[in-house]
Curated annotation (Swiss-Prot):
Glycine amide PTM positions: G36
Known tissue expression: Midbrain.
UniProt family annotation: Belongs to the GnRH family.
GO cellular-component term (any): extracellular space
Name assigned to this protein: Progonadoliberin-2
The organism of origin for this protein: Suncus murinus
Major site of localization recorded for this protein: secreted
Ranges where the record places region Disordered: 25-85
Keywords from the UniProt entry: Amidation, Cleavage on pair of basic residues, Hormone, Secreted, Signal
InterPro entries: GnRH (IPR002012), Gonadoliberin (IPR019792)
Record has Secreted as a keyword: yes
Gene: GNRH2
Length: 110
């Protein structure tokens, strides 16, 4: 008897999980006629065009020739990022964090 009741509960749970309430008005960002987000068909926003790469860029990457593909990039794209934070500011931030840690360890927690 107990297994029949458990089976019925399991069947009802399965039916609840598989039942769909009906079509939804909003679309998921990855589906539908308007890829890119939930928006109405008369939305004034046009999707941005994809960036254009120089001719032969992908061929250079596919052939394993990094020189050919890097020659078409601006020199600033290949340079390492500049560190704009001064050493003094880094030191001050480090001391501030150390002070906070010390206070947290010394003060009793409620």
């Amino acid at each position: 008897m107990a297994s029949i009741g458990q089976g019925l509960v399991l069947l009802l749970l399965l039916l609840l999980l598989t039942a769909q309430p009906g079509p939804l008005k909003a679309q998921h960002w990855s589906h539908g006629w308007y890829p890119g987000g939930k928006r109405s068909p008369d939305s004034p926003q046009d999707p941005q065009p994809a960036p254009r790469f120089p001719e032969g860029y992908w061929l250079g990457l596919a052939a394993g020739n990094p020189r050919q593909s890097t020659q078409s990039l601006p020199s600033k794209a290949l340079a390492p990022p500049e560190d704009t934070v001064s050493e003094e500011a880094k030191t001050m931030a480090w001391w501030h964090l150390q002070k906070q840690r010390l206070i947290q360890t010394l003060l009793p927690r409620p």
